[in-house]
Regions:
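Helix-to-beta-strand junctions that scaffold the AdoMet/dcAdoMet cofactor pocket
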Residues: 40, 120-121, 134-135
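Short catalytic micro-motifs in class I SAM-dependent methyltransferases
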Residues: 115-116
Length: 184
């Protein structure tokens, strides 16, 4: 039986940082360096699907306040542990989803979505919600794997896990199909 997204990410939390260090360390470094250019010290930012806080905690010194949310209790628990160990005070990490009523309309200067849009089945609803919670002239910053381009070992593994029911929804977008969804 296919796991729910929450079940899948709760299980992955234990190995996520180790895997990210092997497969994605350079990508995370490039992503945070690029995002940092767009953020201001006065910004209030939401990191949607923050996972273990890799991006959230890295960008926290660059903004006024950063809220990280994730559906996985285990991911949030690990992110909270890292934030406490690093003495980071301007970050609030909570287990919830993007449709939580506490995420008020027009309440964020920026919304970050790192490596999550490929796992969002109801993408139009999610993008509409992001637009709703952004302040006027707010920014949506995303870095998303486009699995529909090329076939690496990692992409083949994700495809196989999805097709065999071991992984929840995963999209195999190209840059063009992802951009079309975002710009609608």
């Amino acid at each position: 039986m296919r796991p729910t997204a929450k079940e899948f990410w709760d299980r992955r939390a234990a190995v996520y940082d180790a895997d990210a260090g092997v497969f994605y360390r350079e990508a995370y470094e490039k992503t945070t360096a690029c995002m940092r250019k767009y953020l201001k010290p006065t910004d209030t930012v939401l990191d949607f699907a923050c996972g273990t806080g890799i991006v959230t905690l890295s960008l926290s010194p660059d903004v006024k306040a950063l809220r990280g949310i994730d559906i996985s209790d285990e991911m949030i628990r690990r992110a909270q542990g890292k934030a406490a160990a690093q003495g980071i005070a301007n970050v609030l990490l909570t287990q919830t989803d993007l449709f939580d009523a506490s995420l008020a309309p027009a309440s964020f200067d920026a919304v970050l979505a790192c490596n999550v849009l490929l796992y969002v089945e109801r993408r139009a609803e999610v993008l509409a919600r992001i637009s709703e919670i952004l302040r006027p002239r707010g920014m949506f910053l995303s870095a998303t794997d486009c699995l529909g381009v090329g076939m690496t070992r990692e992409r083949m593994r994700k495809w196989f896990e999805y097709r065999t029911g071991k992984r929840p929804f995963v999209a195999f977008d190209t840059r063009e199909t992802l951009a079309q969804d975002i710009l609608r």
